[in-house]
């Protein structure tokens, strides 16, 4: 039978006794403590000699006028000119559209504006060889940043509705429901025609709280609310209301002039130009072909 020998029991007992002896000599095990073992020296006040120029600089930095950005009236925190222009970029292969208040786009724009439409259908990063400028919206007049940011907000809202609320569209919704997941994702990615139509609608005053309307040209606030509701309902039905005297003027610069025909109609307050300002000045590296 399996039995434990006397020598094994002796060794185990000897080990326990040795451990007990060490514990008795060293004392009880000290638990961890959050208090520092050494005293932390208190900070001493040092006398520094400063020059008169350094003292004047410190006084200027403490002044709130030095730290305040040059912002527009009533829009604190936004630098001057922010929102006067709105850029739209599109993916030349998949047709996705990204809006920006700057002439460049980053990966953050892609994360915030592009929803998940399917596996391997969302770009992982911004590649300059795939993204091209679609159009640039410029508002007429000075200090139109608040109006531009309102237009930017409406464009993003309409784009989000096209991508996530497509089932409410009777005809288009039925077409997408009968397609596979990948085909449906490809259709949802192609937002270029919808984005052009959204530009025409937003610049025509569509959307609640759209600042494209000039309040000063209307008789009363109730009249303004009525005109906004009228224009919003007409745009939803596919029409554009002629509100030339009630809308701010805007100019749309196109990379390709044919893209503007994706919209059914443009309001009279919008003018169109070919060529985005600043694109022609960019230096392009010449393509060198081998003689072989």
Curated annotation (Swiss-Prot):
Record protein name field: Large ribosomal subunit protein mL67
GO CC entries: mitochondrion; ribonucleoprotein complex; ribosome
Highest taxon above the source species: Eukaryota
Keyword Ribonucleoprotein annotated: yes
Function noted in UniProt: Component of the mitochondrial ribosome (mitoribosome), a dedicated translation machinery responsible for the synthesis of mitochondrial genome-encoded proteins, including at least some of the essential transmembrane subunits of the mitochondrial respiratory chain. The mitoribosomes are attached to the mitochondrial inner membrane and translation products are cotranslationally integrated into the membrane. mL67/MHR1 also has extraribosomal functions, being involved in regulation of mitochondrial DNA recombination, maintenance and repair, and generation of homoplasmic cells.
Localisation: Mitochondrion
Keywords: Mitochondrion, Ribonucleoprotein, Ribosomal protein, Transcription, Transcription regulation
Protein family (similarity comment): Belongs to the mitochondrion-specific ribosomal protein mL67 family.
Quaternary structure (record): Component of the mitochondrial large ribosomal subunit (mt-LSU). Mature N.crassa 74S mitochondrial ribosomes consist of a small (37S) and a large (54S) subunit. The 37S small subunit contains a 16S ribosomal RNA (16S mt-rRNA) and 32 different proteins. The 54S large subunit contains a 23S rRNA (23S mt-rRNA) and 42 different proteins.
Main location: mitochondrion
GO BP, sorted A to Z: mitochondrial genome maintenance
Key word Transcription regulation present: yes
Region called Disordered, residue ranges: 59-83
Source species: Neurospora crassa (strain ATCC 24698 / 74-OR23-1A / CBS 708.71 / DSM 1257 / FGSC 987)
Family annotation (Pfam families): Mhr1 (PF12829)
GO function terms (MF aspect): DNA strand exchange activity; single-stranded DNA binding; structural constituent of ribosome
């Amino acid at each position: 039978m399996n039995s434990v020998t006397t020598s094994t029991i002796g060794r185990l007992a000897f080990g326990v006794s040795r451990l007990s002896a060490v514990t008795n000599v060293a004392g009880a095990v000290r638990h961890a403590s959050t208090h520092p073992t050494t005293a932390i020296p208190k900070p001493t006040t040092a006398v520094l000699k400063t020059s008169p120029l350094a003292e004047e600089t410190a006084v200027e930095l403490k002044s709130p006028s030095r730290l305040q950005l040059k912002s527009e009236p009533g829009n604190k925190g936004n630098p001057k000119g922010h929102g006067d222009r709105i850029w739209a970029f599109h993916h030349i292969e998949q047709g996705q559209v990204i809006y920006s208040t700057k002439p460049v786009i980053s990966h953050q724009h892609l994360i915030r504006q592009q929803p998940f439409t399917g596996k391997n259908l969302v770009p992982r990063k911004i590649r300059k060889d795939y993204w091209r400028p679609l159009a640039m919206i410029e508002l007429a007049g000075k200090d139109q940043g608040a109006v531009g940011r309102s237009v930017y907000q409406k464009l993003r809202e309409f784009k989000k509705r096209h991508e996530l609320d497509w089932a409410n569209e009777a005809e288009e919704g039925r077409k997408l429901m009968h397609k596979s997941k990948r085909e449906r994702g490809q259709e949802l990615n192609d937002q270029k025609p919808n984005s052009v139509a959204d530009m025409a609608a937003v610049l025509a005053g569509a959307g609640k709280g759209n600042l494209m309307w000039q309040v000063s040209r209307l008789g009363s606030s109730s009249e303004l609310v009525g005109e906004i509701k009228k224009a919003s309902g007409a745009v939803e039905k596919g029409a554009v209301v002629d509100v030339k005297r009630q809308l701010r003027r805007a100019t749309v610069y196109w990379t390709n002039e044919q893209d503007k025909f994706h919209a059914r109609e443009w309001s009279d307050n919008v003018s169109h130009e070919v060529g985005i300002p600043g694109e022609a000045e960019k230096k392009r590296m010449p393509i060198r072909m081998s003689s072989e």
